[in-house]
């Protein structure tokens, strides 16, 4: 099953020569001035994970990922070079496909980012089963930003159904450890967010989860189950009322309508406003890509050249004009979101 079936809702890689050729026209140069370059990027600093969640695309596609990209983490030296080479980047989302706390260089990454005035966040989520005392303190001392903790339950028994290999009580203990340092430093950072995906097996704990989150001084967010065939909801209307999830039926049109009404975020805009970079430097573009990429390595050529590469330019053309011929080397081709837009003739740009 492909990653495209597990689209994320946020509250929100390589022969280079032909891809780095000059832009064909002035209109194709999307970033002409420094202030037009993205100030926000997502750099997946670790794709390793100790859990075995049944519908995780990193598990369902593990063999393919291992063959094409492998699993790994961004070393501190690589992270430092990226930061130093891209002074216009002011915020980095460091979570995506794995668990950031399995990166042995995380403490250095957190500290250096703070020293360089770069905000870090983990909007894409952490499982928080593993964290050292030092890292917990660094998160607070060096002002790590928002951190979404994926829990999906309010008891050890329910948590373990989906977060296989995880320990609910250990996660709560780790949250308390971070809170201890927040109190010590009199800091409200990192803001910890309790993430709960309603399933048929856990929907009875929604109200209890709200109470647990409040007791831990956490905000709570509810996310859509993008694999509705797994543990489908028993009472979707009640869940919708309890969680206020507007797209409980997994309807992409809600996202597009919000974008059309002034919301800045839509899946496809991430390629240009908040590009996703894999741990090995491959430009993946957006959250829809796991094994797919744009055939250019950001660590090797830099972000600006990567975003001006032929494949990225062509992707924007495809998203601006559906008469443009689809090409297999462009990740948008075959994408569920792209097909949704094309079917309704709703261009993004």
Task: Specify the residue positions occupied by each region the protein language model found.
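N-terminal export signals
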Residues: 5-25
């Amino acid at each position: 099953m492909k990653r495209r079936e597990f689209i994320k809702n946020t509250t929100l890689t390589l022969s280079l020569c032909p891809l780095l050729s000059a832009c064909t026209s002035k209109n194709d140069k999307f970033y002409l001035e420094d202030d037009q370059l993205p100030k926000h990027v997502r750099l997946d600093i670790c794709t390793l994970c100790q859990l075995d969640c049944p519908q995780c695309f990193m598990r369902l596609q593990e063999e393919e990922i291992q063959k094409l990209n492998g699993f790994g983490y961004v070393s501190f030296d690589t992270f430092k070079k990226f930061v130093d080479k891209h002074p216009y980047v002011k915020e980095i989302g460091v979570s995506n496909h794995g668990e950031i706390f399995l990166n042995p260089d995380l403490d250095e990454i957190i500290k250096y980012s703070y020293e360089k005035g770069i905000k870090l966040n983990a909007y894409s989520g952490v499982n928080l089963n593993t964290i050292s005392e030092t890292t917990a303190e660094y998160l607070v001392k060096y002002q790590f930003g928002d951190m979404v903790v994926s829990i999906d339950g309010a008891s050890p028994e329910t948590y373990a159904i989906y977060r296989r290999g995880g320990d609910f009580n250990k996660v709560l203990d780790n949250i308390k450890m971070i809170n201890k340092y927040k109190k010590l430093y009199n800091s409200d950072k990192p803001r910890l967010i309790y993430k709960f995906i309603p399933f048929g097996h856990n929907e009875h704990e929604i109200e209890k989860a709200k109470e647990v989150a409040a007791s831990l001084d956490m905000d709570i967010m509810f996310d859509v189950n993008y694999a509705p065939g797994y543990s489908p909801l028993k009472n979707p209307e009640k869940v919708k009322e309890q969680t206020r999830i507007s797209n409980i039926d997994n309807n992409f049109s809600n996202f597009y309508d919000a974008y059309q009404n002034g919301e800045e975020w839509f899946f496809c805009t991430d390629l240009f406003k908040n590009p996703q970079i894999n741990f090995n430097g491959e430009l993946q573009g957006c959250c829809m890509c796991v094994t797919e990429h744009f055939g250019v390595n950001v660590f090797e050529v830099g972000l600006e050249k990567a975003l001006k590469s032929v494949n990225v330019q062509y992707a924007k053309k495809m998203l601006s004009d559906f008469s443009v011929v689809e090409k297999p080397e462009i990740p948008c081709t075959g994408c569920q979101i792209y097909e949704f837009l094309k079917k309704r003739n709703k261009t993004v740009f």
